Amino acid sequence: MLGFLNLHKPTGMTSHDCVGKVRRICGLKRVGHGGTLDPLATGVLPIALGPATRLLHYLPDQKTYQATIQFGLTTTTDDLAGDILSEQSANHLAQEVVEKALPQFLGSIEQRPPAYSAIQVKGQRLYDLARQGKDVTAPLRQVEVFDIQILDWQGGEKSELQVEIACGPGTYIRSIARDLGEVLGTGATLAQLTRTLSCGFALADSLTFETLAEQVQAGTFSPLEPSFSLQQPILHLPPAEAQRFCWGQKLPQDCADGMMQVHDTSDRFLGMGEIIDGLLKPKVVLPAQ
């Protein structure tokens, strides 16, 4: 089995848990995911099956989330899973004030990941250090936020803002919620998170575990072809050159430099190659299917 699964991750499971469950359902050992989702989050979790795990690095890295941010509350994890650090009324907040604060979170920004996160400091993950009671400050990281759109606003003691955020890899929506609360002086935490787009996969096309299991049992499950989500240009090779590519040999090509999807003339996906100075160098060669 080779290809991708657009999994609809349920709440309450880690991304690692999801990989394990897919292994059991599909009867595969080689399974990987294309970007961690917090246990409380739901939505798109790209899954690579078999040798397609070698292609995860080449998938598009933009992500889109729908998030609900609750004001007047801060927690140890920057979401509702953590212990409460502070509470106050946020009924004085107006949507217009919140809206004016959002542009500072756009573009290339410095962001501090949550204390409970998978970021490593001196070889240890922050969530392990936090559970040990160690007070470690996460290092600042540069991330990209392309767009923030307000979807809904509910005023009150714990005012809530629903937004859609398009961002690059490594962006923590929990950190945006926390930092927005600090800017507005009320504190805030992430109340709900759904990833609607990741690695080129959309939520509307995702499969639940239940649907996946039904399809596997019925023999109707078919992984998505690599080219479904890869966005690099396609280079078609004639039979002799395709064979040489599969042997790992460099090939002269009169094309612009860059990463390419490599296909044969029957449009069978062979792998990924990079053209540098007129030479195609195989980067990933997949086994014949």
Swiss-Prot record:
One Pfam family, short name? TruB_N
In this protein, the active site sits at: 38 (nucleophile)
Mind listing the GO biological process terms from this record? mRNA pseudouridine synthesis; tRNA pseudouridine synthesis
GO MF, any single term: RNA binding
Kindly report, in one word, the top-level EC class recorded for this enzyme.
Answer: isomerase
Keywords (alphabetical) are:
Isomerase, tRNA processing
The EC number of this protein is 5.4.99.25
Catalytic activity annotation:
uridine(55) in tRNA = pseudouridine(55) in tRNA
Entry's InterPro entries?
A: PsdUridine_synth_cat_dom_sf (IPR020103), PsdUridine_synth_N (IPR002501), PUA-like_sf (IPR015947), tRNA_psdUridine_synth_TruB (IPR014780), tRNA_sdUridine_synth_fam1_C (IPR015240), TruB_C (IPR032819)
HAMAP family cross-referenced by the UniProt entry:
TruB_bact
Q: What the protein does?
A: Responsible for synthesis of pseudouridine from uracil-55 in the psi GC loop of transfer RNAs.
The similarity annotation says:
Belongs to the pseudouridine synthase TruB family. Type 1 subfamily.
The identity of this protein, by name, is tRNA pseudouridine synthase B
Q: Which organism is it from?
A: Acaryochloris marina (strain MBIC 11017)
Query: Which gene is annotated as encoding this protein in its UniProt record?
Result: truB
